[in-house]
Amino acid sequence: MTYGAGGSTRDLTAELVIDMNRENDFPVMAHLTCIGHTHDQVKELLDQYAEAGVENILALGGDPPADGSDPGGEFDFACELVELIRAHGADFSLGVAAQPELHPRSPDHQSDRRWLAEKLSMADFGLTNFFFDPNDHLLMVEELADLGCHTPVLPGIMLFRNL
């Protein structure tokens, strides 16, 4: 369940995630972005998800607002969100984003892989954005292994389903 994709509103996402988790016989993975959030807001969402039995979270940095305004909030990077989720106490299955072709905000290749390895070290798995060359994914996994990171990184695919 996406959360503020493209900088859009995320007002109903938690309610929809909780409803889908309760009403369907398949696991729901809540996307949770940190952009524009305070720590207390995220803790409140995590409390709601834990209380409702939501077990899976994909922790993301998130897109800036579509209008280009300052999103505010207390987070700068997804690693900070992952740390907060791990400290929460609920036993969420926690995924993070990975970009085989490098994160758009990365200053260079080496720092991109170091930050990704750090983020993955706190997660259960990584999930990539879409990519077209499978060699990019294979190279990323090799580079992460060279850094001592062996957390699984799954190729992202798009499944279309309307509920």
PLM features per residue range, with description:
Residues 105-121, 126:
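Active-site glycine-rich loop that binds ribose-phosphate moieties when present
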Residues 1, 28-32, 57-59, 94-98, ...:
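Hydrophobic faces of well-ordered beta-strands that scaffold small-molecule active sites
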Residues 73-100, 105, 147-163:
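Active-site pocket-lining/capping segments in soluble small-molecule metabolic enzymes
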Residues 7-20, 38-44, 63-85, 106-109, ...:
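Active-site-adjacent beta->alpha loops and helix N-cap segments on the catalytic face
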